[in-house]
A protein has these predicted regions:
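Hydrophobic alpha-helical transmembrane segments of multi-pass membrane proteins
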Residues: 13-23, 42-52, 72-76, 164
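Alpha-helical transmembrane segments in multipass membrane proteins, preferentially the mid-helix core
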Residues: 77-84, 107-111, 129-151, 169, ...
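Central hydrophobic cores of alpha-helical transmembrane segments
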Residues: 40-45, 96-105, 150-162
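C-terminal ends of transmembrane helices
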Residues: 21-33, 78-89, 140
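C-terminal membrane-adjacent module
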Residues: 142-225
Length: 225
């Protein structure tokens, strides 16, 4: 870069990109005898942030830098936190912690975006919390100690009902009227959205009933023995 352009123009971008690639091979873990997965996750995340920061400086676009870093952090948190907690005393609650942390980070992401681009952040946070409810409640149910088939059936049924009414909740929170739950299987052109939602609702509830039925049967069989 110095020889050709007589300045350090693209040098730092290439250097940060090489560091990012170096961390993913992975090479930083060779310097540690333990907790290599933690070293890998931290080093790769920081190297990505370094590359993004370098690009942001060169493009004068620091407004999106923190947004990108938080978004990537959400992905890392969802993948690695359950793994890190799997061998601890709180391993039963790993998914509760993971989904709750993801919800908090998503809210922080919305707040950060709101700082640079004004929008209705409070309704956005409310619908985010609503969308995370099935995941968090399902994680709580899975942490309880009872029949696995019953837990699966309850989680599917609860999540199905909550997500079925997502568009309705969005309309109520944002004051719109865009969702339609009208069902008419003889007219798919105008009622395709409602028809598909209804079919998914029935299929998923049927699956949940099947799981619950198997769970009850296994419990009854166990009690008879």
């Amino acid at each position: 870069n110095l020889a050709i352009n007589h300045t350090l123009s693209w040098f730092f971008i290439v250097l940060s990109a090489l560091i990012c690639a170096y961390s993913f091979i992975p090479n930083f873990t060779f310097f540690f005898n333990s907790k290599k997965l933690l070293v890998f996750s931290v080093s790769t995340y920081l190297s990505i942030c370094l590359l993004l920061f370098t690009c942001a400086v060169y493009t004068n676009g620091l407004t999106w830098f923190l947004t990108a870093c938080i978004g990537i952090l959400i992905g890392y948190e969802v993948i690695f936190v359950p793994i890190f907690l799997s061998r601890t005393k709180i391993s039963r609650f790993k998914f509760i912690i993971s989904f709750t942390a993801a919800c908090v980070l998503t809210i922080l992401l919305l707040i950060n975006i709101h700082i640079w681009n004004s929008f209705r952040v409070v309704p956005a946070i409310l619908i985010t919390c609503y969308a995370f409810i099935p995941a968090i409640i399902s994680a709580v149910i899975c942490a309880l100690r009872f029949n696995a088939f019953l837990k699966a059936g309850i989680c599917i049924a609860f999540s199905t009902v909550v997500y079925y009414f997502t568009n309705f909740v969005v309309d109520k929170i944002f004051g719109t009227n865009n969702s339609s739950y009208k069902v008419n299987f003889s007219n798919w052109q105008q009622y395709s959205n409602g028809n598909i939602h209804f079919i998914c609702l029935i299929l998923l509830l049927s699956i949940s009933i099947l799981f619950i039925g198997v769970g009850i049967f296994r419990l009854c069989k166990k009690n008879d023995q």
